[in-house]
């Protein structure tokens, strides 16, 4: 296999991958088909027991079950509470977070653009986070998600200047003497909202109940296209446990592989979209039952448990964090949650994710030095070129030597005409005699392929690059080049690289395909994020310089075609 064919295979492989991505998105239904889940019968009970026990996997219950139970108690009228910090604006209603705005992330770069709304009450695509209590016994009073009453008269909480923490207190009290105090805590420059529930039993009988935490969403219809970066990223539910690690389920085939039904200790659940995510993170030492479900067209992922039996005169507590925010690597790391870094979804495959995380770490270090994400991409490419130089040198030396013997190869092709077998045999004899390794260019490309694909997802997924400028006309590295300057430069770089690439034994069809390859890539790159095209241009430009220098240094004068061709061994 010669270098031209390797390049051709690599190029068409990329095209095939991108076309497959596009096809898979177009094939998917825009939203799940609406289904209805009825409330469970009274006989379908949860065997709540000692602290740490979890609800049965047999119960199909959803937040609606707990809400129905709560009707037996005095459910207060809607009490909307607004909480504003330096980074978040939340709207709460009992145990529901109905709306969440990310104040430091405008929707567009236009002046006065509203902030990104991650959770929303939009009737077409509602998206909320819910935390409530249910019980094994439908006669046991529980707050559900709607029974919590705000303590005090303040309905608008604002984190004041110089204040680092803000607490919002709620309470639910039953006629049997059971009280659940809920405290929500928000902190400066944090997207994790801390929930703490304290259960006290001042009654005469034990009280059984379990906490549930749910993400409930009707997925937004995306414009599925290679020109829409939002459709590149994974959109769906994810969860993590210490045994099976990171798992995920796309909205488009939400229940295709079942409803999960898995007991997990110390895990978490989330819903991801491009650049942002929402996640429930229970206590590390507590076990919950994780369930996927669909209710009236809404996709839900829920952690049920742990369950508690609280004896008279006793109390217990449980805590969780609700993350509502961007996929900022440094802030996610501060939460110290195993596997939470995987929400920056570089790949569903662990090896590719590790490569992506490593590449972003290097990119981030370069950014700290240069202070600009565009120049950080350039710096990352330079570092990768230096690290991979030994492999590239082998590739270019092999190419230079093959280019030197182009006249001989052309003579062999002319001599054997359409007899491909004899031509290939003679060419391999020539390679053997002159100590040319035709596979010398393959290994470097194969090694660089996973790096390229991982870097592709790093540039697509990293919210740090969102609306980040480079210089001049590039004011958003996650948007396409508005004037197509980088794609045109990329076409030129590929064309010159093609001219320097040796092409022994290429037939006319391959030659035509190679001539169109720069144009195909140019059209494809024209609508991709400019940060990715910048990487491709710098990487290709440096590769072109390396190849030109290696060809000049190691190529030498072409071997004249008058030299007798290598003999063909007859079998």
From Swiss-Prot:
GO terms for cellular component: plasma membrane. GO terms for biological process: protein insertion into membrane; protein transport. It holds the Pfam family YidC_periplas. The chain crosses the membrane at residues 4-24, 369-389, 440-460, 483-503, 518-538. It is a multi-pass membrane protein. Its main location: membrane. The keyword Protein transport applies. GO terms for molecular function: membrane insertase activity. Keywords: Cell inner membrane, Cell membrane, Chaperone, Membrane, Protein transport, Transmembrane, Transmembrane helix, Transport. InterPro entries: Membr_insert_YidC, Membr_insert_YidC_N, YidC/ALB3/OXA1/COX18, YidC/Oxa/ALB_C, YidC_ALB_C, YidC_periplasmic_sf. Residues 34-43, 55-78 have a biased composition (Low complexity). It is found in: Cell inner membrane. Residues 29-78 are annotated as: Disordered. NCBIfam families: PRK01318.1-3 (NF002352), yidC_nterm (TIGR03593), yidC_oxa1_cterm (TIGR03592). Belongs to the OXA1/ALB3/YidC family. Type 1 subfamily. Required for the insertion and/or proper folding and/or complex formation of integral membrane proteins into the membrane. Involved in integration of membrane proteins that insert both dependently and independently of the Sec translocase complex, as well as at least some lipoproteins. Aids folding of multispanning membrane proteins. Interacts with the Sec translocase complex via SecD. Specifically interacts with transmembrane segments of nascent integral membrane proteins during membrane integration. This is Membrane protein insertase YidC. It comes from Stenotrophomonas maltophilia (strain K279a). The lineage of its organism: Bacteria, Pseudomonadati, Pseudomonadota, Gammaproteobacteria, Lysobacterales.
């Amino acid at each position: 296999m010669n270098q031209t064919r390797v390049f051709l295979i690599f190029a068409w492989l990329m095209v095939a991958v991108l076309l497959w991505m596009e096809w898979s998105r177009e094939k998917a239904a825009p939203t799940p088909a609406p289904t209805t889940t009825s409330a469970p019968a009274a006989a379908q009970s949860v065997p709540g027991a000692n602290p740490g026990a979890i609800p049965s996997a047999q119960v199909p219950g959803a937040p609606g079950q707990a809400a129905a139970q709560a009707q037996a108690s005095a459910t207060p009228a809607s009490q909307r509470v607004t909480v504003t910090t330096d980074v978040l604006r939340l709207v709460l209603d009992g145990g529901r977070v109905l709306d969440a705005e990310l104040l430091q992330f405008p929707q567009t770069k236009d002046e006065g653009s509203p902030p990104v709304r991650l959770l929303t009450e939009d009737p077409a695509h509602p998206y909320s986070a819910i935390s409530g209590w249910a019980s094994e016994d439908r006669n046991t009073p529980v707050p559900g998600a709607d029974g919590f009453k705000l303590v005090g008269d303040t309905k608008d909480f604002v984190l004041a200047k110089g204040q680092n923490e803000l607490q919002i207190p709620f309470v639910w009290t039953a006629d049997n003497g059971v009280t659940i105090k809920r405290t929500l805590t928000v902190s400066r420059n944090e997207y994790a909202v801390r929930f703490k529930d304290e259960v006290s039993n001042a009654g005469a009988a034990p009280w059984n109940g379990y906490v549930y935490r749910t993400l409930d969403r009707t997925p937004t219809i995306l414009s599925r296209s290679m020109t829409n970066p939002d459709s590149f990223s994974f959109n769906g539910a994810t969860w993590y446990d210490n045994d099976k690690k990171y798992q995920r389920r796309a909205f488009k085939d939400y229940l295709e592989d079942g409803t999960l039904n898995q007991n997990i200790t110390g895990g978490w659940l989330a819903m991801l979209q491009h650049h942002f995510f929402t996640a429930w993170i229970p206590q590390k030492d507590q076990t919950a039952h994780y369930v996927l479900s669909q209710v009236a067209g809404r996709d839900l992922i829920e952690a049920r448990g742990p369950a508690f039996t609280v004896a008279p005169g006793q109390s217990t507590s449980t805590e969780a964090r609700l993350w509502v925010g961007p996929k900022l690597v440094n802030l996610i790391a501060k939460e110290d949650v195993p596997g939470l870094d995987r929400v920056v979804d570089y790949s569903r495959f662990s090896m590719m994710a590790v490569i992506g995380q490593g590449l972003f770490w290097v990119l981030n270090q370069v950014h700290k030095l240069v202070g600009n994400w565009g120049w950080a991409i350039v710096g990352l490419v330079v570092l990768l070129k230096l690290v991979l130089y030994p492999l590239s040198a082998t590739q270019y030396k092999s190419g230079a030597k093959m280019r030197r013997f182009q006249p001989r190869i052309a003579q062999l092709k002319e001599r054997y005409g359409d007899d491909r077998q004899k031509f290939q045999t003679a060419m391999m004899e020539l390679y053997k005699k002159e100590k040319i390794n035709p596979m010398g260019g393959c290994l470097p490309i194969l090694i660089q392929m996973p790096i390229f694909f991982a870097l592709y997802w790093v540039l697509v997924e990293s919210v740090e690059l969102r609306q980040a400028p480079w210089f001049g006309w590039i004011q958003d590295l996650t948007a396409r080049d508005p004037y197509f300057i980088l794609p045109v430069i990329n076409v030129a770089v590929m064309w010159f690289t093609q001219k320097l690439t040796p092409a022994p034994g290429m037939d006319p069809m391959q030659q035509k395909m190679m001539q169109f390859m720069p144009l195909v890539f140019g059209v494809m790159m024209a609508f991709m994020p400019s940060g990715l095209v910048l990487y491709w241009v710098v990487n290709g430009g440096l590769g072109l310089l390396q190849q030109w220098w290696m060809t000049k240094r190691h190529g030498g004068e072409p071997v004249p075609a008058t030299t007798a061709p290598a003999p063909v061994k007859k079998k």
